[in-house]
Amino acid sequence: MSNETRDLYNYQYPSSFSLHEMMNLPTSNPSSYGNLPSQNGFNPSTYSFTDCLQSSPAAYESLLQKTFGLSPSSSEVFNSSIDQEPNRDVTNDVINGGACNETETRVSPSNSSSSEADHPGEDSGKSRRKRELVGEEDQISKKVGKTKKTEVKKQREPRVSFMTKSEVDHLEDGYRWRKYGQKAVKNSPYPRSYYRCTTQKCNVKKRVERSFQDPTVVITTYEGQHNHPIPTNLRGSSAAAAMFSADLMTPRSFAHDMFRTAAYTNGGSVAAALDYGYGQSGYGSVNSNPSSHQVYHQGGEYELLREIFPSIFFKQEP
């Protein structure tokens, strides 16, 4: 039994061919596969598959020519492998180049930091220059701000003050006022009151205080000029109030002062503050008592006013 098994494994078929013989079979005459002569010293029985793989391109070409009747040129066989090598080199170059560029990009911050460390004086000088420029800009802006504030202060409206003997602090002048503040006066027991005109878009202000030297004297100071006519007619003289509309008044007019003199001379009740709202100036102290008024004027101007105003205003009391 053991002998039969051994013979089974060692049995060789007579009609079988080796791999080398099959590779060297000619294609032109299939009947001659079992009887292959050696050509040019090529013995297929001694040429193994390993030798075929390790053979040179010339031997591999001759083997193909003898076996299958093919004669490919060496350029056609190895063209693909040759063409692939430059592509591989280019790919490697691109990859290597990208890596180099990334390395250079990453290294650049360290290079800049090292350059900064090598030249600390230049950086300190630049930063110092920047601080100086910022300081100069701040100084210029401060100067411009101070100049603007000074200009705003210079645009303050002119002030005109009047002294009147009266027991009442707030004298009637034909305009409506609103009290918005009160302040103590230094070296005086009497406070100072602040008023504002109630007409819209009118910025006229006035302040009223009593003199600490003579408590019977009321000092009224007007700031600005009214831009509207008198809202109400004054007591007892509507014609006089109409004559002094805003379009006929001019600052510091001597005619206005002379009219005030005529009004008091005739005993009318036109208040002395009629002209205060327009910012006119008096040439002396005005007394609320018509019998004891005191106003100074020039002779030539007085004669001119007599021709302009009705004569009834210039009648002298006996």
Swiss-Prot record:
Region of interest: Disordered: 74-158
GO CC term, one of those recorded: nucleus
Main localization of the protein described in the UniProt heading: nucleus
Compartment(s) where it occurs, according to its Swiss-Prot or TrEMBL record: Nucleus
GO BP annotations, alphabetical order: positive regulation of leaf senescence; regulation of cell fate specification
Listed InterPro entries: TF_WRKY_IIc (IPR017396), WRKY_dom (IPR003657), WRKY_dom_sf (IPR036576), WRKY_plant (IPR044810)
Biased composition (Polar residues): 74-84, 106-115
A GO term, aspect molecular function: sequence-specific DNA binding
Regions recorded as binding DNA: 166-231
Biased amino acid composition, Basic and acidic residues: 116-126, 148-158
UniProt xrefs under PROSITE patterns: WRKY (PS50811)
NADP found in the keyword field: no
Membrane found in the keyword field: no
UniProt KW keywords: DNA-binding, Nucleus, Transcription, Transcription regulation
Pfam entry (one): WRKY
Listed PANTHER family: WRKY TRANSCRIPTION FACTOR 28, WRKY TRANSCRIPTION FACTOR PROTEIN 1-RELATED
Function comment: Transcription factor. Interacts specifically with the W box (5'-(T)TGAC[CT]-3'), a frequently occurring elicitor-responsive cis-acting element.
Family indicated by similarity: Belongs to the WRKY group II-c family.
Record-given protein name: WRKY transcription factor 28
Organism: Arabidopsis thaliana
Gene encoding the protein: WRKY28
